[in-house]
Amino acid sequence: MNGASVFLAGALVSAAWLMPAATAQPACVAANASVPPGANTADRSAPFFIDTAGLDFSTAPPTRDPANAGYPRATELPDGTLPPVGAEGNFIIGPNHRPAPETVAQDNVPRGTIHTFTITSGDSVIYNPGIVRDDPPNCRNGSVYTAETAPGDKSNLVFATSHPGTWTRTIDVYVPAGYVPGSEAPFIVFGDGGATGAYPGRDLFTILDNLIQQRRVPPMIAIGIGAGGQDAQGSERGREYDAVSGAYAQWVEREVLPLVEQNVGAKLTRNPDGRATMGISSSGAAAFTMAWSHPELYQRVLAYSPTMVNQQWPHDTALRGGAWEYHANWPGPTGPNLNVAVNVVTPSEAPAGTPLIPNSPPKPIRFWFEVGDQDLFYPNPVMADGMHDWALADEGMAKVLAAKGYRYQFVFARNAKHVDRPTVAQTLPSALEWLWKGCSIQ
């Protein structure tokens, strides 16, 4: 989607805020992990088909078989081994996941410094005001899991518990040992960062200490950006990470990176070959979208269990399947396909639901990503839309990336759940080394 679609999405958010607030909060409903009620699992030709072939429902979420006929072929590696750093394509690892030695701090390895500062929605232009969703007390995503979908469209989640609000988040900046202030440096920016983010103890920074000392990656600055708050549709986190637009990349470029340079005395490279994005789950999808929307800014992407599914909210008529449409058709009923130009929705000449990657010229993106055999499967029980199987989505990404000649390494992990911590500890050092291979900036 082009930049104009960002403004359309903003208009849709504004319209959603005009809806009346719910008068009573629903009871708490837990996340789903099986086929949702009312799903179409029988007729592949009918709208919103959910393919359950090859899924073992004795576990929750179901366990996927990497030999599934619907998945691209992959190389199965001996248990405990990882793909070669120079290898590209699809690989299967596990079932055991021992932490890599680079995850442990070493006394003889110089340590980088960590600088932390805080930003608020009042400081922002792009994300001011923020979004806050009213969930039942102590009920994560409660109002999302009890919402309804639009009549005839299982992909369009409709609820009225979100409203304008504020956000506060921390930014962690890792500066490698020996960095000369003011010198140009490559960097990696990752979502779900900060002190309460997805990297407790800032494990990534220890890994970078070791990899930089071993000269396996260039000395780089790492920027961990805290999420905006809550999760999924109707939240600030979901608004930022799940939108298939350039808005988040623009926010990072215009509002975060200048503060990083100001606070730590760094000079971040403007060369996209020396800029990387990283994330987990929805921030993993955002990491890819940053590079897809702005390849002139980012060309290296790393993601664990990226949410390449239909999580974008509000529903965008220009891309009804959200990130699912990177790799696959929108599975809803046949209808007009739309695009956005100069804030006007117009008919598209492309077939309805045309996926983005297969129908766009290849972009200079290098992508490492992973998914678990027990990754998420239709966590929202009301969205039986055929677009919420994380493993199928990421396998679909591997398929279309290969067909378009992208440079990528995709890891399917046995005995691994969503953003599986043992798998992250096993693979992140080698993933970072693969990601930065061939970087022209040292």
Task: Give the positions of each predicted feature.
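Positively charged n-region of N-terminal signal peptides that target proteins for export
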Residues: M1-S5
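Bacterial N-terminal signal peptides
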Residues: F7-W17
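Boundary at the C-terminal end of the N-terminal hydrophobic targeting segment
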Residues: A21-P26
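Non-catalytic cap/lid and distal C-terminal segments of serine-dependent acyl enzymes
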Residues: V29-V35, N40-D56, P61-T63, Y71, ...
